[in-house]
Regions:
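TOPRIM metal-binding catalytic domain and adjacent DNA-binding surface shared by DnaG-type primases
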Residues: 1-68, 72-74, 117-123, 188, ...
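Short phosphate-binding/catalytic loops that engage adenosine nucleotides
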Residues: 39, 143, 190, 201
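Phosphate-handling DNA/RNA-contact segment within nucleic-acid enzymes
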Residues: 53-166, 181-182
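Short, acidic/turn-prone active-site loops that include or flank metal/cofactor-
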Residues: 149-154, 173-176, 197-200
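A structural-propensity feature for long, helix-poor, extended segments
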Residues: 165-179
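Short, aromatic/basic amphipathic alpha-helical patches
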Residues: 180-190
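Metal-dependent DNA phosphodiester-chemistry modules and their immediately adjacent helices/loops
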Residues: 196-197, 207-223
């Protein structure tokens, strides 16, 4: 089960995995930041989040002081394996005024589904979020969730990964881009339903209304 994940070759996979293990040793540096976003330490460790503390591997120099978000993929006959990572700026500033996006993706990466390891176990339903941290919050409270790296990142061939699910719930942001994402996914996935959010995205909803707010949003499409 693979999408456009990079890299494929063994040497580069091992390099990324070694880097992730290094960055994960600095997790304590960002626990307060993650907690402020609703992510528990247990969840952070489960997803192997890390931080680049002035020790980037070659090629990661531009991501110093970023949160590292490993992309883990299921492997037949073994545990899920880290194959790539994205980065999130951890500095308390307006990223736009500093001429860089909040989330950074290595050059040449065409985009991948986050947390495909969640799809390794047979289930009747799956939840799709707009953003990695949103999917972590849903998983934190018992919903199997994956994420797209942006509202416009859907790729047609991903459809095959979701064919076995009876129910798919789309948690896109409540804005025009999020609405377009929901429409795109509902066209591609007939069994998909859009979960309406009003407060903000999944993280905003959770921070303001807790799990109850998320449950109430989901209940509106389950009734």
């Amino acid at each position: 089960m693979y999408d456009s994940i990079r890299p494929y070759n063994t040497a580069e996979r091992r390099r990324i995995q070694k880097a992730s293990a290094l960055y994960e040793t600095h997790l304590e540096n960002i626990l307060d930041l993650l907690s402020a976003r609703g992510i528990s330490e247990e969840t952070a460790r489960y997803h192997h989040l890390g931080y680049i503390d002035n020790d980037p591997i070659p090629g990661h120099e531009d991501y110093n002081q970023c949160i590292t978000i490993p992309y883990m993929y299921p492997v037949w006959g073994g545990p899920a394996e880290i194959r790539k990572m994205r980065f999130r700026c951890s500095l308390q500033h307006d990223c736009k005024t500093h001429n860089h996006p909040k989330y950074l993706t290595p050059a040449g990466d065409t985009g991948s589904i986050y947390n495909m390891a969640a799809m390794a176990n047979p289930a009747a339903e799956i939840h799709i979020c707009e953003g990695e941290f949103d999917s972590m919050i849903l998983e934190q409270y018992g919903w199997s969730a994956v994420a797209l790296p942006g509202a416009t990142s859907w790729q047609t061939f991903w459809t095959k990964f979701f064919e076995g699910y009876d129910h798919i719930y789309i948690w896109s942001d409540p804005d025009p881009a999020g609405d377009k994402m929901a429409q795109t996914l509902q066209t591609a996935l007939p069994q998909a339903t859009h979960v309406p959010l009003t407060i903000g995205d999944v993280t905003d909803t959770y921070l303001q209304a807790g799990k109850t707010g998320l449950t109430q949003a989901l209940d509106t499409v389950l009734q």
